Amino acid sequence: PLPAIVFGGRRAKPAPLVYQSKSWDNGVFVGPIMASETTAAATGAVGVVRRDPMAMRPFCGYHMGDYFAHWIEMGKKVKNPPKIFNVNWFRLDDEGHFLWPGFGENMRVLEWIVKRCEEKVGAVETPIGYVPDPKDINLEDSGVSEETLKELLTVDKETWKQEADGIEEFYKQFGDRLPKELSDELATLKANLNK
């Protein structure tokens, strides 16, 4: 069986280096809110958040709300659905430098994902999901300090409150075809951010 599904976006701030969803429905919520910030390689303004649900926007041949509902239903049909993770290799510091080296170093994060699926490591609960305990990411010879890793794994509630507002606005386009489970997950996220 498939143990994990990994989504990813390109965000300067909100998304941590990696986080695990709290449940299948929560993971399906994470997929549609995937976003990247436009770069100089794209036409238009730089730094604009562009949402691309599950990286399928250009490829989905039917209503995305129905596509999300299909994912929700899959989770009900599978006895042990895969764990869902989100990665963000592109987090920046306040000076605009990448905090994570990327490329082959990404294997360090994938190793944590595999260990989570095998129940060999724990995690720290946050309002958005589970992030690694910094001690569970092997930093040996990576050039990344423990302090930088902690910054990479930080979930800033105020930034995520703004993100939640953006998600709510994004979801409006799906109208009544947005699965209730995703609306419920958004409400839960907002409640978690206000604790």
Residue ranges and their predicted role:
Residues 1-195:
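Conserved NTP phosphate-binding and transfer environment spanning the P-loop NTPase/kinase superfamily
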